[in-house]
Amino acid sequence: MPDFSYGATTDRAAGAQRLVTKRPDLTMLSRTADSLYWVSRYVERAEYLARILDATTRLTNLPHAYGGAGTEWHSAVLTAGCEEAFAKAYGEANERNVCDFLTFNPDNPSSIRNCLALARANARAVRTALTSEMWDALNSAWLELQRFEKKRMDREEFARFLDWVKNVSLVFDGSAYRTMLRDDGYWFSRLGVYIERADNTARILDVKYHVLLPDTEQVGGSLDYFQWTTVLREVSALTAYHWVYREAVKPVLIADLLILNRRMPRSLAACYENISRFLDLLGDAYGRQGPAQRQARKTLSSLSNTQIETIFEGGLHEFISDFITENNRLGATIIDQYLQ
């Protein structure tokens, strides 16, 4: 599976270009736009890592009668997109090593600690472009994170920590939605959210592929059901699933909800609907459409014109891997087009 593409920090060259716009009220520096984009991506990524660890913990806490797959912690590393870095640092993928690597390890660029640190660093560099509520959410989170880091956490405290990380993202996202002016700063911030969220939804859906069923367990059995239910729970979609489909948990319907259903906020289709909208707003404001707009429309069109049965026929894992590659490519195109 493709690795995470790491973002900018605050040490960009001082000679940032001013974005050319046909609207006099939009005069943002590319450096400012870049930082706003990456603040949102890093906060969203921290939440995703918390969801991955929460899901993995649930899978490993199955009653003994179910048996375990024994691959859950390795799957967490694979799904986080950092298998090679983890192997160099730890080797064995057990609970202690994976939790340490994905939460507080300062040498992992995409640990929760470093995601929140980089989000705060980028936010501080463009402090005047943020509302006070957004800055307070990040600054308070950073101070609280240091208190968590000093604690000796048992499983109960670790679960509280993961819930706290998810809440940090909700507070920051809500602050941005409620307080930012609807201009190019907001549009770049939302692009960061949805590019990252699309990547994360694809990866957390793929976690089921990497958690293998034991030889004694059948597809459609109790363990398989529990694993798929965990996937739904970790994208806050269990209630939505039953509301939309009104039947027992089925893999094909879960994939339909998380890939193609635009009513589901974390679905790939919903993410790309928003990505296309915000890119079009930027294109209109800056007076030209470019490769980013074309790539986003192509992906949205593909998602709109496919059926979930077609995806399963070609292989769900293969579809997700291709999607992650294309999503990373769009992220790079946005940077080239607007943020360099």
What residue ranges belong to the model's regions?
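Alpha-helical transmembrane segments and their helix-helix packing motifs
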Residues: 2-10, 19-340
